[in-house]
From Swiss-Prot:
Gene3D superfamilies: UbiD C-terminal domain-like. GO terms for biological process: ubiquinone biosynthetic process. Pfam families: UbiD (PF01977), UbiD_C (PF20696), UbiD_N (PF20695). GO terms for molecular function: 3-octaprenyl-4-hydroxybenzoate carboxy-lyase activity. The lineage of its organism: Bacteria, Pseudomonadati, Campylobacterota, Epsilonproteobacteria, Campylobacterales. It comes from Helicobacter pylori (strain ATCC 700392 / 26695) (Campylobacter pylori). One of its GO terms (cellular component) is cytoplasm. This is Uncharacterized protein HP_0396. It comes from the Bacteria.
Length: 616
């Protein structure tokens, strides 16, 4: 990692923070705000992390690196080769054909020879490792961060979690948040669909303890590979070798039968008693909401080893945009060829960062026959991690660039009709809070591949329309119409919820189809109708398609408000991840925050719109 830091410094992508800052909130808050600056801000190296313990201050001799992945330039520096080149290599590998002549044969031999790098190579441990075992183990000696005020504690957020199947035939590298309970216990938040969880059940059935090792740092590409959506049974370090063009060099662990890369900065080893679960959380997650307290497995740590000059790598997740935007971009590009294997008419796809990946995907396809888009929808919802996507919109090959926001929205609105909207049900991300049931909920697929026959509405200005609708639905506060020149304008309405569900009250507006097409209801207290970026983030987070959509002849009503018992939603509704104003003021006093008010208004850093406008 030291070499990567030198590279960042050379290219002006690194900011060094020498001011002592607390591992509880201060470091994470500063990194969170930095990531929202234009072009992702800088990578931040905190040289003096501290922790206040009663009347004393604990200093850590280990710097903390954050926002390391947080720009396209830093991605390029990390990869050392163009993303397009990696994508082409992946495509060539997946579409391997027998050579037709001698020249093609030589190329095939070269490609096959390059695959020798995919298998990790065993090596010995570095001799200068500092090793702590048994009673010497103390996780509290690491600068593990508490990132959000309501978090259940400190969490390791960029740990490479190494596991293997009971018969040692399958290996997995994943990334899961890891809660520090005490000196030698970590909570393992691996969800029901993760490979590690499948291995866990094997060990539980056999009634033996499961070995788990966690590595931090080293080549940052290990960390990205831990997030890669590979098919079950394919080891992520093989992907590392494919991308790097060299074998991952792995060393044996001291306490268990696993191996981890020998250049990692920190290694935590131990075992999981599969018969014991502990409450884990809450945690402010990448959805921008806190996930609730739930039981998860616990790692009993037997060994911690680290380099003398080790660096602690961490991230902060929450409301977008953050560095996972760039990590997700690499995933998009590299795995497009793999997705095309299951959906061969797929041309391109895009996961907007304010759709927080699984909540929204746009896809461009070659449409060849009636209902083709619906066929691809089902293909998406049946493939790996794509099965967790809640909302998918499909456009034809003549559509604009998927990243040209205004152009693609106008295209979709011209082609949208309720007849071409498919509402289904299936598995969803375990972090999704809007679904009525855990890990299962509604899905919405929109076929916008051809022109709609929906007639254009008779437009009213915002003031006239507001007065008309308030007469029939008294809890409406404000509204704003987007893209009024299209066939399906979007009318966003802020409401104050009382004792009835919004979807029930929306039936009072069915008589105004002449003026309405797509109507989206949001909470007045937490939304700025003039901020479409944050509106989209809240909308796709807060809806379950089967429960929260009402349709009529030409209208499509969507309830994106917070849900409760009145909405027949009986799960706990979470709060948003908001920065602590006390911490923000402390960072300001230390001269570390600039342009905070602008970023706060744009990305709702501290609290929702209706409150923050009073403080700015």
């Amino acid at each position: 990692m030291r070499d990567f830091l030198k590279l960042l410094k050379k290219h002006d992508e690194l900011k060094i923070i020498d001011t002592p800052l607390e591992v509880d909130l201060e470091i994470a808050h500063l990194a969170y705000i930095e990531a929202k600056k234009p072009n992702g801000g800088k990578a931040l190296l905190f040289t003096q992390p501290i922790r206040k313990e009663h009347d004393q201050i604990k200093t850590f001799g280990m710097p903390v690196l954050m926002n390391a992945f947080g720009s396209f330039k830093r991605l390029d520096l990390l990869l050392k080769t163009p993303i397009e080149s990696l994508q082409q290599r992946m495509q060539a590998f997946l579409h391997f054909n027998a050579p037709k002549n001698f020249t093609e044969g030589l190329k095939v031999l070269k490609d096959l020879w390059d695959l020798r790098h995919i298998f990790p190579k065993k090596t010995t441990r570095p001799k200068d490792l500092i090793i702590k075992q048994d009673k010497e183990v103390n996780l509290l000696d690491l600068p593990v961060l508490k990132t959000w005020e309501k978090d259940g504690g400190a969490f390791i957020t960029m740990g490479q979690v190494y596991t293997q199947s009971l018969d040692h035939q399958k290996k997995n590298l994943g990334m899961y948040r890891l809660q520090v309970y005490d000196k030698n216990h970590l909570g393992l938040h691996w969800q029901i669909h993760k490979d590690s969880q499948l291995f866990f059940h094997e060990y539980a059935k056999a009634k033996v303890k499961m070995p788990v090792s966690i590595a931090i740092g080293g080549d940052l590409l290990y960390t990205w590979c831990a997030t890669a959506p590979l098919p079950y049974g394919i080891y992520e370090l093989m992907l590392y070798g494919f991308m790097r063009g060299k074998k991952a060099r792995v060393m044996p662990c001291l306490s268990n039968s696993l191996s981890v890369p020998s250049d990692c900065d920190i290694v935590i080893e131990g075992f999981v008693d599969c018969e014991k679960l502990e409450l884990e959380g809450p945690f402010g997650d990448h959805t921008g909401y806190y996930t609730p307290i739930e039981p998860y497995p616990v790692l009993e740590v037997k060994t911690i080893s680290y380099k003398k000059d080790s660096i602690y790598l961490a991230t902060v997740v929450g409301k977008p945009p953050l560095e996972d935007k760039y990590m997700g971009y690499l995933t998009e590009r590299l795995f497009l060829p793999l997705l095309q294997m299951n959906a061969p008419n797929l041309i391109e796809y895009y996961m907007p960062e304010n759709g927080v990946f699984h909540n929204l995907i746009l896809a461009k396809i070659h449409t060849r026959y009636n209902a083709h888009a619906k066929q691809v929808m089902h293909a998406f919802w049946g493939v790996g991690q794509m099965s967790f996507v809640k909302h998918a919109i499909f456009v034809n090959e003549d559509a604009p660039n998927l990243r040209d926001t205004n152009a693609i929205i106008e295209y979709i609105l011209e082609n949208f009709s309720k007849e071409n909207a498919l509402i289904s049900q299936g598995v969803c991300d375990a972090l999704d809070h809007a679904s009525p049931e855990y890990a299962m909920g509604g899905k919405l697929g929109i076929d916008a591949t051809s022109k709609s026959n929906t007639p254009y509405p008779t437009l009213l200005n915002d003031s006239a329309l507001l007065a008309l609708l308030q007469d029939k639905m008294q809890n409406i506060v404000l509204l704003k119409q987007y893209y009024p020149h299209t066939r399906n304008p979007i009318c966003v309405i802020s409401v104050e919820k009382k004792d009835k569900s919004v979807i029930e009250l929306a039936k009072n507006l069915l008589g105004f189809e002449e003026h309405l097409r797509i109507v989206i209801f949001v909470e007045h207290a937490s939304n700025d109708l003039n901020n479409p970026y944050m509106l989209l983030w809240r909308i796709v987070n807060n809806i379950d398609a089967r429960r929260d959509i009402l349709t009529s002849k030409h209208c499509f009503f969507i309830d994106a408000t917070n849900k409760g018992v009145m909405d027949k939603h009986f799960r706990e509704w979470p709060t948003e991840t908001n920065c602590s104003m006390e911490v923000i003021e402390n960072l300001k006093k230390k001269g570390l925050l600039k342009d905070f008010e602008t970023l706060n208004q744009k990305f709702h850093l501290t609290h929702s719109f209706s409150t923050h406008k009073e403080d700015l």
